[in-house]
Amino acid sequence: PPRSTLFPYTTLFRSVLNSRLMDRPLRPLFPKGFFNDVQVVATVMCMDNDAPSEIAAMIGSSVALSVSDIPWEGPTGSVLVGRIDGEFVINPTSAEREKSDMHMVVSGTKEAIMMVEAGAEEVAESDMLDGIMFAHEEIKKIVAFIEEVVEEVGKAKKEIECYKVPEDIENDVREYAEEKMRAAVLTVEKQERLDNMDAVEVETQEHFAEKYPEGEKDIANILYTITKEQVRRLILDDCIRPDNRKHEEIRPIWVETGVLPRCHGTGLFKRGQTQALSVATLGPVGEGQRLDGISEETEKRYMHHYNFPAYSVGETKPMRSPGRREIGHGALAERAIVPVLPEVEEFPYAIRVVSDRKSTRLNSSHVSQS
């Protein structure tokens, strides 16, 4: 297809990915029970290609939330990690990024890592872990700086009062339903497991309907908490997933190729209740996608576009242009596949893959890469 119509959000592509980078380390640090809308806007006023704007935006967002009166359990720091000739580099310049075999954004607090997003050229897992630890040392310095700023100009945080389920209801529900929910969570087949979990909730609600006539929401919240605790305990303590699989086991995978005879390449991938149809199309190298934004203009020879139609989860909604989720998941697949593509001299084609979800149960982004 013509270059201009390859992707409807060409100019916003990088902004969408950067906003997702900003969001992921910030969102988990808002306290449970805080339901106010919070909007963080990062605007690039001036651009230096040697200083990644996304890192400045992530740190700036952390500073803004930290000095405000908004309840938030930051601050966080963020860095870009590269690796050149086996040596890690913090926030590499544009020229250094060209030589780096790793591009990893790490964000965290003083105590823990909050987010990692990376692309690498077949780098060993141990090296990636070393890179994360290297980044965390720099993050601690950034957090210390932000804490100094907060001490000087920060506002007192607003106090929020969260509703707490009455202790007697929680104790009764746990005593009655905890083991039942554990047994339901261990059901092997997914739909049957969900049905069993729903049955436990219905049974529990009926059991306590007379004793706690206005406690339906409280009981539902307690059961949700019990489910999370059981899943977490099974995984961390017993190394068992909710469907009785060990942590190294995967569900059966089914793949069929050549599904559409007129296309250059097609693959239908199925795992559990998730299915995806991916279609690959080849074109001249000149039909690659040009990314023209505030940073250096670049071209992509490989384009991976991810579609998540409402029907794949049994819903209806207007069919619009790709949203943040689709753009982000397409970029995730690109990051995994580009490093293993043959060089352009060996394979002089532009490649476009479109992955459509046909049926989805929980996470489906990884299916695009398969």
Residue ranges of predicted features:
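Single conserved hydrophobic/aromatic residue that forms the stacking wall/gate
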Residues: 1-11, 358, 362-370
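Glycine-rich, flexible beta-strand/loop modules in the N-terminal catalytic cores of phosphate-handling
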Residues: 8-39, 44, 51, 110, ...
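Alpha/propeptide regions of enzymes that mature by internal proteolysis
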Residues: 10-31, 35-41, 51-59, 64-67, ...
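Flexible, glycine/charged-enriched surface loops at secondary-structure junctions
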Residues: 32-38, 73-75, 142-160, 191-192, ...
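Conserved phosphate/anionic-ligand binding catalytic regions in large, soluble enzymes, centered on
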Residues: 51-69, 255-280, 359-361, 368
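Extended, hydrophobic alpha-helical segments in both membrane/secreted and soluble proteins
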Residues: 61, 328-337, 349, 353-361, ...
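Mobile "lid/hinge" segments at catalytic clefts and subdomain interfaces of large enzymes
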Residues: 69-188
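Extended amphipathic alpha-helical scaffolds
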Residues: 158-298
